[in-house]
From Swiss-Prot:
Name of the protein this chain belongs to: Chitin synthase 2
Keyword hit for Cell membrane: yes
Entry EC number(s): 2.4.1.16
Keywords: Cell membrane, Cell wall biogenesis/degradation, Glycosyltransferase, Membrane, Transferase, Transmembrane, Transmembrane helix
Comp. bias intervals (Low complexity): 43-58
Domain of life of the native organism: Eukaryota
Encoding gene per record: CHS2
A GO CC term assigned to this protein in UniProt: cell septum
Organism from which the protein derives: Paracoccidioides brasiliensis
Length: 1043
């Protein structure tokens, strides 16, 4: 007995020492193949096994038979824990693997297999999922007959005080492969009877000492290697079961619980919108969404709310990085809305007035990793959607959930601890790919009619709005009731550390975006008509978009383009609706008996990625150029619609001035090919004169002859390439053409600078004449060119945003011939390519399953059997989102065009080419290339470009002055309201605070009036300081080169 007691004490001390090895056995990710070693003859009792870790699901685990003492015990030597590999005994030590003990024949899944809480979150009181029995492992020995049942407790040894994943009394292992460890323990316990019998044989004694090279090895055969796709380790496959579900108004609507892991770290769980995801299978057209009785959460129950801001995010096949960049930017904007506690509209519950609608264009097209990101936020669950409901095909799958977490572009969770507020999300995944215009029809005609919002904001996936962008867009509508649409400032993404500027394409587009936001958009905003509100970041007043009683209006004209695709539409109308947002802008301004205007909001900034390869760049600009050209023609033809509006006389005059400016710009666009050739012909040809030749020996003449014929042949080659090739198929030829255009442009610039230097080096008698304004080279080249480039610099400095002039202007001017020739030729040669739909998308798929009707109000469908299956799907989505893998690109088949559109394309290209050719030949014959100072046409072209630049600069300056005056007047009104009489201040507070308090708008007197005045002054000064701080921050950001 004394010997047994000492053995038991020794066993206890060993087990205390070996707690960390036991913990390592459970948490190791990949256990190495284990070898079965015999047991030592001198084993102690098993009475001192470590106690079990507290279960994560109290009260739900099955009862296990208590431990039975045997004559053998586990004797584990003390060792250190390796974070990367299991422990291996040294050759100089004597070690024996001890007999594992058998357990009950029924084993259960551990509670941590599918519902491990998020690391670092308070979830110690959370109960786990119900557990299922595990199947017996398949081994090479027959089943063992256990004499008794033994329970093996697994303890978490060691000090966990410094472990970042210890929460309360529970240790959470981040991404621990629990399933592999549990299988190892079960396999060892299954072998215990065989090891007990082998223990008595003499050969099972294993001693490892220095002089012994051979070691006895007992290899376990696990069977042949598996073939095919294997399940992810640590994640079980969700099991589906058939259930009967009651229909709501004949339609399938499901309320699904969110995964337990997500539920465990939510700060708010007090409402069903936080704990359940709502799925609706929409079987009707978007125009009939409300007519058929479909409702959203904002229309029913405790979540019935008014929607002030409705955000639309359109998505095609973008990856999870682009999606999270946009979605996380929206979540930050919602946090800014909620931080404006003094606002009469917003506040800490301002998120209840904002709804974000994500529309995926085609279930087969959406990126699977983007779905994983949505699933990680709780918005999407796999296995819920169905293809057919009640014998009706499903057109869209609508998921609704109020998420409280966000994923940043690094795929890291951000929650309330980072200031993230709840966000009402509607995820509409269309069954078929029907293009972006149809997605907007779902947004405006289906969900917009159900919510009836005040302001609608349109975003593209990939656009990252700055934290205050959406607020400034909304504020433009709140301050002016005549504003029907607003455009934000789109800036080109320059990559990490501005490394994208080393790509000439990215740099040139950065310059183009900047100058458009400095010159073009402010000019059009002063007139009240912006030709295009960018779909990447724009906003509309929903009331202004509605049609009149006869069914005609902006939305009817906007969606007319979707009805025309695939029908007998002429080429002009089809190309015009390639830029349908331009048609929408025109219809808003020209709406009958209304006086709507469009506004540019420069403080609303969004960053978007721009094409960085030649094929992608050309394909994008093809649609932009064709749509812009034909939409401009449409607005100029129908300019008389302005007369039927309720605009003031001053506004109508300004709009007609803008129409004249657009007509001149359109004419220069049409003849841009000839004007480029003539400019090169006269400026570069001037160096062919032997008296001016900088190289001597007529080298300048030979260079000009080579470049001249090269330019002509290259233009002809562009037509050949554009008529029968796509940029993706002939990328090298398109790229080589752009390089040759750059060489021609650089020689032209060199020629212009050399002639100016020669003019300045003339004799003293000729200096006065050469530098005077008139018909001379100095006037034509220097004054006109510097007036254009100089205005670019002046306006950039005026807007405190000049860095693009130093980093991107050279690349832009070098690629300017490619903009004029390459892009314009390709666009006009592909006017026949107007198809938007995808052929074959009308096939009804059944890969998701169908909901078969069983009675008049119930259907039978397959769903995840219980909470454990929902959790497993969430675990798999989270694990896949955390890995870095690429989704294979889908091939896009070449669209077939009708013969009629091809014929019209031929006629149009022929007319355009012949008109430019006649102009180039006539002017080149009328004027010689050696007489630049007396060339009237060159003077007309250069001075026209300079005049248009001056006109844009005047309009942009007026826009800046109006903004400054508006801010001064706004600040003066706030100061006057805060420093006026008690009545004036009280009324102002009553309107600004949203009616908070019964004393709003009541005259105060005496000490109460002084107290109210002091308090009001403090609040207004605080608001003014906050607004000034944001303005200073934006201005300082513009002055930084790396912005």
């Amino acid at each position: 007995m004394a010997q047994e007691s000492s053995n038991m004490d020794q066993s206890k001390s060993d087990n205390v020492t070996d707690n960390k090895p036991n913990r390592s056995l459970i948490s190791m990710a990949r256990p190495s193949p284990q070898r079965c070693h015999p047991l030592d003859q001198q084993s102690a009792s098993t009475s001192s096994l470590p106690t079990s870790r507290p279960s994560s699901s109290p009260g739900q685990s099955p009862n296990i038979t208590p431990s039975i003492l045997t004559s053998d015990t586990l004797h584990l030597p003390a060792r250190s824990v390796s974070p990367t590999r299991p422990w291996t005994p040294s050759r100089g030590s004597e070690w024996s693997r001890h007999m594992p003990l058998s357990v009950s024949s029924v084993n259960y899944e551990p509670p941590e297999i599918n519902c491990s809480p998020r690391p670092g979150t308070p979830s110690s009181k959370y109960g786990g999922s119900p557990r299922r029995p595990l199947r017996q492992p398949v081994v090479c020995w027959p089943p063992a007959s256990s004499a008794g049942e033994t329970s093996i407790d697994i303890a978490d040894g060691g000090d966990d005080s410094e472990d970042p994943f210890v929460v309360g009394e529970r240790t959470v292992h981040q991404r621990s492969n629990t399933r592999s460890s549990i299988k190892l323990i079960q396999f060892t316990m299954q072998l215990s009877p065989q090891l007990l019998q082998m223990k008595r044989t003499p050969w099972v004694k294993l001693t490892l000492d220095d002089g012994e090279d051979d070691e006895s090895d007992f290899n376990v055969h696990y069977g042949p290697a598996p073939t095919g796709r294997q399940e992810r380790r640590g994640v079980r496959k969700a099991q589906m079961t058939k259930k009967e579900v009651r229909l709501m108004n004949g339609e399938l609507v499901l309320e699904c619980k969110i995964p337990r892991m997500l539920h465990s770290f939510l700060p708010r769980r007090d409402d069903r919108e936080f704990t359940h995801m709502r799925y609706t299978a929409v079987t009707c057209d978007p125009d009939d969404f409300t007519v058929k009785g479909f409702k959203l959460r904002q229309n029913i129950g405790s979540t019935m709310r008014e929607t002030e801001l409705f955000v639309c995010v359109t998505m095609y096949n973008e990856n999870e990085i682009d999606f999270t960049r946009t979605m996380h930017g929206i979540m930050r904007n919602i946090s800014h809305f909620c931080s404006r506690t003094k606002s009469r509209t917003w506040g800490k519950d301002g998120w209840q007035k904002i709804v974000v609608c994500i529309i995926a264009d085609g279930r087969q097209k959406v990126h699977p990793r983007t779905l994983n990101a949505l699933a990680a936020m709780g918005v999407y669950q796999d296995g819920i959607a169905k293809n057919v409901v009640n014998q009706k095909p499903v057109n869209a799958h609508v998921y609704e959930y109020t998420t409280q977490v966000s994923l940043d572009p690094d795929l890291k969770f951000k929650g309330a601890e980072k200031g993230i507020m709840p966000c009402q999300v509607i995820f509409c995944m269309k069954e078929r790919n029907e293009k972006k215009l149809n997605s907007h029809r779902w947004f405006f005609n289906a969900f917009g009619r159900a919510l009836n919002p005040n302001i609608c904001i349109l975003l593209d996936v990939g656009t990252k709005p700055e934290p205050t962008a959406l607020y400034h867009l909304w504020k433009a509508f709140d301050q002016d009731s005549n504003v029907a649409g607003a455009a934000g400032e789109i800036k080109a993404g320059k990559g990490k550390g501005c490394l994208g500027l080393f790509n000439p394409l990215v740099a040139s587009q950065n310059f183009e975006y900047k100058m458009s936001n400095i010159l073009d958009k402010p000019l059009e905003s002063v007139f009240g008509y912006i030709t295009v509100l960018p779909g990447a970041l724009s906003a509309y007043r929903y009331h202004a978009l509605q049609n009149d009683s006869t069914g005609h209006g902006p939305l009817s004209m906007y969606f007319k383009g979707e009805m025309l695709h695939g029908k007998n539409a002429d080429v002009f109308t089809a190309n015009m609706y390639l830029a349908e947002d331009r048609i929408l802008c025109w219809e808003l301004v020209a709406k009958r008996e209304e006086q709507w205007v469009l506004k540019f909001v420069k403080s609303a900034v969004g960053e978007t990625d721009v094409p960085d390869t030649v094929p992608e760049f050309i394909s994008q600009r093809r649609r932009w150029l064709n749509g812009a050209f034909f939409a401009a023609v449409y607005s100029l033809i129908h300019f008389r619609q302005i007369w039927r509006t309720d605009h003031t006389i001053t506004r109508k005059i300004l709009l007609h001035i803008e129409f004249l400016y657009q007509f001149v710009s359109l004419a220069f666009t049409f003849f841009s090919l000839a004007n480029f050739y003539l400019t090169f012909y006269f400026i570069a040809g001037a160096l062919s004169d032997p008296t001016v030749d900088p190289f001597g020996h007529n080298i300048g003449k030979y260079i000009f002859a080579i470049l001249r014929y090269t330019c002509v042949l290259l233009i002809c080659l562009q037509f050949v390439l554009s008529m029968g090739n796509r940029p993706q198929g002939a990328k090298k030829m398109f790229l080589s053409g752009m390089i040759i255009y750059c060489i021609i442009m650089m020689y032209t610039v060199f020629s212009a600078l050399y002639m100016v230097v020669m003019q300045l080096k003339t004799s003293k008698e000729m200096i006065k004449d050469s530098l005077s304004l008139g018909n001379n080279t100095f006037t034509y080249i220097i004054v006109s060119t510097l007036s254009t480039v100089g205005l670019y610099f002046f306006m950039s400095f005026l807007y405190l945003d000049p860095w693009h002039m130093f980093t991107s202007s050279i690349q832009y001017f070098a690629l300017l011939p490619s903009y004029i020739c390459r892009l314009q030729i390709y666009a006009f040669c592909n006017t026949h390519d107007v198809t938007w739909g995808t052929k074959g998308d009308n096939v009804i798929r059944t890969d998701l399953g169908t909901a078969r009707i069983t009675s008049s109000s119930t259907v039978e469908l397959e769903m995840p059997s219980e909470q454990l299956d929902i959790d497993s799907g969430y675990d798999e989505s989270s694990a896949i989102s955390a890995t870095d893998s690429k989704c294979p690109r889908q091939s896009h088949p070449r669209r077939r065009c009708r013969k009629t559109t091809t014929a019209v394309r031929t006629y149009m290209v022929s007319v355009w080419f012949i008109a430019n050719a006649i102009l180039a030949m006539a002017v080149s014959e009328a004027f010689t290339e050696k007489s630049v100072g007396n060339n009237a046409y060159l003077a007309f072209v250069l001075w026209s470009v300079a005049s248009l630049a001056v006109f844009r600069a005047v309009g942009s300056t007026a826009f800046a002055i109006l903004n400054v005056v508006h801010r001064v007047m706004e600040g003066k009104m706030k100061f006057a309201a805060a420093g006026g009489t008690g009545y004036g201040y009280g009324s102002y507070v009553g309107s600004s605070s949203g009616g908070g308090g019964g004393s709003s708008g009541v005259r105060s007197s005496g000490a109460g009036s002084s107290l109210g005045l002091s308090s009001g002054m403090g609040e207004k000064v605080s608001d003014w300081a906050s607004e000034t701080g944001w303005a200073v921050k934006r201005t300082a950001g513009k002055l930084r080169f790396w912005r």
